[in-house]
């Protein structure tokens, strides 16, 4: 009965309406309600309490107080930042680690050198840029013989094969024997492409072997610098070479 009565009373109540901002105050925005004021007041009170606590802490601070965390924290732009701690390594451990690095790099360099030698033997590399080119010298008695000299006729081979330093058959050999291997244009292009790919791989391996050699030298130089012997820098370090130092000579017992 009471519940039905409350419902009947509520149905006859006037609808609650919030007062809106008057027209002459429209430029000030929406009219602040009680809930908006409460949020603003709570935020203001919270900030004031925080400032009050900071003032109290500053008044009660002991100028001689010390915490061990102070040795690991620095103030940067008003913010406390923990300093990065470096790993402590003894000189003996560091020297051993660098020795291991040198051994590993030297092992990789030797492996690259073996692969280079294998590729060179497979490609019959006689005129590669990384190796000094061979020279064939002809001797003559007169200047007229030099002017009339024909390399293809002297070597008894075709003019197209003169620039070769390997696989250069004579004309009589070409006339007697049949051409062995692939003769169609497609097959020749495929073989030339594969050969060029192997040459590119060889070039990359030679460059990698050189870089590993330079890295090993630089690591060895840094390892030698850990010695306490007096030293003088003779040449600065570059991309392709390590720094050169002159060490004080010591008499060995």
UniProtKB/Swiss-Prot annotation:
Any one GO CC term of the record: extracellular space
Domain of life where this protein originates: Eukaryota
InterPro entries: SSU_processome_Utp11 (IPR007144)
Protein location: Nucleus, Nucleolus
Main location: nucleus
Phosphoserine PTM sites in chain numbering: 241
Region of interest: Disordered: 1-21
Site of covalent link Glycyl lysine isopeptide (Lys-Gly) (interchain with G-Cter in SUMO2): 74, 83, 86, 103, 120, 143-144, 180, 211, 218, 235-236, 246
GO process terms (BP): nervous system development; positive regulation of apoptotic process; ribosomal small subunit biogenesis; rRNA processing
Phosphothreonine: residues carrying this PTM: 90
UniProtKB keywords: Isopeptide bond, Nucleus, Phosphoprotein, rRNA processing, Ubl conjugation
Family from the record: Belongs to the UTP11 family.
Protein task: Part of the small subunit (SSU) processome, first precursor of the small eukaryotic ribosomal subunit. During the assembly of the SSU processome in the nucleolus, many ribosome biogenesis factors, an RNA chaperone and ribosomal proteins associate with the nascent pre-rRNA and work in concert to generate RNA folding, modifications, rearrangements and cleavage as well as targeted degradation of pre-ribosomal RNA by the RNA exosome. Involved in nucleolar processing of pre-18S ribosomal RNA.
Subunit organization: Part of the small subunit (SSU) processome, composed of more than 70 proteins and the RNA chaperone small nucleolar RNA (snoRNA) U3.
Protein name (database record): Probable U3 small nucleolar RNA-associated protein 11
Naturally occurring in which organism (per UniProt): Rattus norvegicus
């Amino acid at each position: 009965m009471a519940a039905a009565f409350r419902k009947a009373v509520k149905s006859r109540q006037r609808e609650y309406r919030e007062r809106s901002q008057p027209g002459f105050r429209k430029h000030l925005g929406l009219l602040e309600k009680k809930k908006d004021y409460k949020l603003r007041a709570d935020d203001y009170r919270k900030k004031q309490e925080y400032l009050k606590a900071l003032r109290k802490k500053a008044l009660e601070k002991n100028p001689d107080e010390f915490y061990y965390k102070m040795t690991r924290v620095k103030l940067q732009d008003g913010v406390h930042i923990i300093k990065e701690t470096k790993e402590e390594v003894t000189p003996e451990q560091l020297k051993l680690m660098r020795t291991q690095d040198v051994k590993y790099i030297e092992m990789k360099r030797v492996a690259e050198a073996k692969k280079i030698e294998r590729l060179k033997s497979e490609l019959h590399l006689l005129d590669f840029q990384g190796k000094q080119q061979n020279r064939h010298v002809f001797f003559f008695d007169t200047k007229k013989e030099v002017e009339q000299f024909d390399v293809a006729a002297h070597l008894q081979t075709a003019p197209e094969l003169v620039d070769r330093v390997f696989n250069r058959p004579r004309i009589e050999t070409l006339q007697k024997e049949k051409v062995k291997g692939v003769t169609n244009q497609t097959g020749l292009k495929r073989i030339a492409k594969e050969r060029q790919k192997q040459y590119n791989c060889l070039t990359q391996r030679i460059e990698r072997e050189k870089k590993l050699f330079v890295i090993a030298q630089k690591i060895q130089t840094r390892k030698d610098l850990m010695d306490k012997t007096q030293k003088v820098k003779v040449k600065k370090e570059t991309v392709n070479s390590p720094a050169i130092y002159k060490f004080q000579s010591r008499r060995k017992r």
